[in-house]
């Protein structure tokens, strides 16, 4: 097993160990044990920077099911390394922050188990080369995030948010599964790199469009893009460390990773370019607009996260235009990939810090309601400093890193509007317009975030707690991120050669050299747009109290949340009514539906698929076989008209004994003996049960012939006969019985073929079947013992009274 595999599996192993440690080390905060895991992974990933800088990649394989093309293949290039550094680096800071945020009285064993499970799943997503393995880790992120969001499960809002995120992201996961299966059909491979190398085969496939749509749905749901963004604001009910981790650097970035990774395959389609770009821009505008009217600090950050993800998504869509050009023209549009990667890093730094500060404010004051907050500037000066740095970076104000990536975003929108491709030159003017409007509202909610908390009147009477500055443990992580915001803003070259260029080269088909970011590069359209954004943003902030009321009056029926909640109520009710229409308490009706569907399916298949019935190799029917069958049918027929339970049991046993005799004639004496034993025991058990039944020796109701029952019974029998004959006459492969005949004696050293098959060749089946019976028996025994114990206790109470 390689170190790369260990890096992915390590969090999953610790996720199993942590609950055990929690039981034995309750005096020490469990976070100190967990902290070592992401730090070790982060240090290991740092050692791989030189590998990706030189243009090399790391490919490691762990055999799993090689015959099916299913191996645990890990592939690390610049893009995978970038995400791995974010997952482990931000993960380390989040764990450190959680030590100060969560008290020892919390269920820390569960929390860190879920967190490490999520961390390992995210590493698996960004490093897997096998799409099936990627999908398994993808769904594991949804499952583990559900556990994290619902951590405070005593809160109804937490349960609602967790269910909502699970439903939407799992829906996207199923779409992703369909998409990757359609990708694997033309290439006959599950390897992502093989698919990229043979992208032309996929593009010529009739499944290309369907695969593209399904994969985009999977990515959009995970990264909370329009209109699937509604799960993210409700997921804010999770503890703040979860929000800082999942919703700034990891889970919501998984969709961006998928789009970036699949761009070499789908960039040839204009549908990919238009859809990814427009969905990103619409998400940017809509979420930034909604962020301004939120009354909860986490609500503001939730919609701001959706907005920033939309910006990155749009840049990935614009960058795909580069696949339709060559040389310098291609590099012009590929600059959008560079901007997307840079902003992805920047967003993780400033948004992670802002989430942590929000948690600090909540921890200090007991509320996140902006109506109750204000005037905390002198009370929480360190938190104020961190907030100003990171919020201004989010607003796109120099000299912070967010300004550089925001400028790059505006440049890409102006560049894309001039592309003579896919009719972009006709409608492309919308790109910079939407980008500028979205950036204006981004500026507004970023500045208002600072003002809501630290400026205005201090209202101690409305705060559940007396406000105070939080501990150093809660300030250290956001302070580190705020420092990175400044460093990456003033010295972006630290990232360009080591991280950004290798990551961009993983997405783009041409090599990007000499990536540079500057605070000022002339009076360009992007710079002038920035000035317009500042001016309009300040005007909107000054008039905030007037126009924000209009947004807050938005009718509920015009929101996606309204329709989600309505569907969540209507669909279960409709499903229940539909199910109750055919599933009843009457077993006979249920069996009619089940067997009727079987008969219908059988005969539809028979009349739609060509087949042959071959009677040449059928053994001749002997007279004693006919006699046994007549006896069997007679016993079964008499059961229908039996008026005594005892007679029904005897006739049912006669059917079983007749089958045993047939086994003898077909040279299977062991099966016959087994059947005899089973029938004898079954008959004895029936008689014992019969003894405890009410004393009714005869049925009072009059039996009448029911045509439906007869047709269903006859249809099932006929279906089984026809299926057996078709299967016997249409064998496309050699019978497996020959294998047993050749190897039953030399491999298993047995003389009875049936016994050897059951005990050796299918020994695991027999073992598990026996285990199931044993467990069922223990369960029945336990219930009987508990019942007797309760009856004894009840009698004792009565005697005492």
Swiss-Prot record:
The keyword Nucleotide-binding does not apply. One of its GO terms (biological process) is proton transmembrane transport. One of its GO terms (cellular component) is plasma membrane. GO terms for molecular function: antiporter activity. It is found in: Cell membrane. Its main location: membrane. It holds the Pfam family MbhD. The chain crosses the membrane at residues 4-25, 30-49, 79-101, 108-127, 131-153, 166-188, 208-230, 243-265, 270-289, 302-324, 339-361, 373-395, 429-451, 472-494, 526-548, 589-611, 621-641, 646-668, 672-694, 707-729, 767-784. InterPro entries: CPA3_Na-H_Antiporter_A (IPR050616), MrpA/MnhA1/PhaAB (IPR005663), MrpA_C/MbhD (IPR025383), MrpA_C/MbhE (IPR046806), ND/Mrp_TM (IPR001750), Proton_antipo_N (IPR001516). Na(+) extrusion is completely inhibited by the H(+) conductor carbonyl cyanide m-chlorophenylhydrazone (CCCP). Mnh complex is a Na(+)Li(+)/H(+) antiporter involved in Na(+) and/or Li(+) excretion. Na(+)/H(+) antiport consumes a transmembrane electrical potential, and is thus inferred to be electrogenic. Does not transport K(+), Ca(2+) or Mg(2+). Belongs to the CPA3 antiporters (TC 2.A.63) subunit A family. May form a heterooligomeric complex that consists of seven subunits: mnhA1, mnhB1, mnhC1, mnhD1, mnhE1, mnhF1 and mnhG1. This is Na(+)/H(+) antiporter subunit A1. The lineage of its organism: Bacteria, Bacillati, Bacillota, Bacilli, Bacillales. The gene is mnhA1.
